């Protein structure tokens, strides 16, 4: 078998660099978050950040249905006392004890009430506290990223090597 040419090596190197850069971006974005999820995607601007935008909606129906111009879909209406009008918050925000949460327009306080759509009253004592994660270098994540990049490079190398070997078996008739 032939040694891989400069084109195959260049392709493997570029693929490895792209994987390394992506892993570095995800590691930086996920720092302080519990695992890789919506928090990391918000920091990378892949997922719309709705927490600040929910507060701008002042009507319950607009809040729970979402505003198409702002791409909102995870807002709920929170009302703590009957005399207060309530406000729109993101579902992920901490809810005060004793507040009613409305997630359908039929259940909004100003709208007509349907007996099957009762608001959910939150009676939890304290919100869950995320695990403490000290900022800094995480050796296990670094080793995992290196193993991931090297394995992807090896797969790309062997796939290109296999395709190159298949092409070299064909001979012209003339």
UniProtKB/Swiss-Prot annotation:
Location of this chain's protein in the cell: Membrane
Glycosylation, residue list: 71, 103
Main localization of the protein described in the UniProt heading: membrane
Topology relative to the membrane: Single-pass type I membrane protein
Extracellular face residues: 30-141
Extent of the signal sequence: 1-29
Transmembrane segments: 142-162
UniProt cross-references to InterPro entries, sorted A to Z: CD164_MGC24
Keywords (A to Z) from UniProt: Glycoprotein, Membrane, Signal, Transmembrane, Transmembrane helix
Cytoplasmic domain ranges by topology: 163-174
GO CC terms, sorted: cytoplasmic vesicle; membrane
Family matches, as PANTHER family: CD164 SIALOMUCIN-LIKE 2 PROTEIN, MUCIN/PORIMIN
Similarity field: Belongs to the CD164 family.
Protein name: CD164 sialomucin-like 2 protein
GN (gene name): CD164L2
């Amino acid at each position: 078998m032939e040694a891989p040419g400069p084109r195959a090596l260049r392709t493997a190197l570029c693929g490895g660099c792209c994987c390394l850069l992506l892993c570095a971006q995800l590691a930086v974005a996920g720092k302080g978050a519990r695992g890789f999820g919506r928090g990391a995607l918000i920091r990378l601007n892949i997922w719309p950040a709705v927490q600040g935008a929910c507060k701008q909606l002042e009507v319950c129906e607009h809040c729970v249905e979402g505003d198409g111009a702002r791409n909102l879909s995870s807002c709920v209406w929170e009302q703590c006392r009957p005399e207060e009008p309530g406000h729109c918050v993101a579902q992920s925000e901490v809810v005060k004890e004793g507040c009613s949460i409305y997630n359908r327009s039929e259940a909004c306080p100003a709208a007509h009430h349907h007996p099957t759509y009762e608001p959910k009253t939150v009676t939890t004592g304290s919100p869950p506290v995320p695990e403490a994660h000290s900022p800094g270098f995480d050796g296990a994540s670094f080793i995992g990223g290196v193993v991931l990049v090297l394995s992807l490079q090896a797969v790309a190398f062997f796939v290109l090597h296999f395709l190159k070997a298949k092409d070299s078996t064909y001979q012209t008739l003339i």
